[in-house]
Amino acid sequence: MNCLVSGRVQGVAFRAAARRHALALGVTGRARNLPDGRVEVLACGEAEQVEKLRDWLWNGPPLAHVTDVVCAPVEVPEITGFEIE
């Protein structure tokens, strides 16, 4: 699943928190800042765990203020770990 997270999500440790949460759920993927101020999160794993991560994205870490999360299913090769780009 690929998600685009909007709001105050850069400069608030959003990517690092997403990585910690994803790894705790057993989800692999990546998180990266986009030039337009959003954060892109690519998540791979068991559907239930990926959905839990998606739900978490709506809150994010304490300093974040999420205004929108748009997710879409994507086909991705096998990913190990969770990277921050």
Question: Where do the model's predicted regions map?
Answer:
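Intrinsically disordered, low-complexity, mixed-charge
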Residues: 1-85
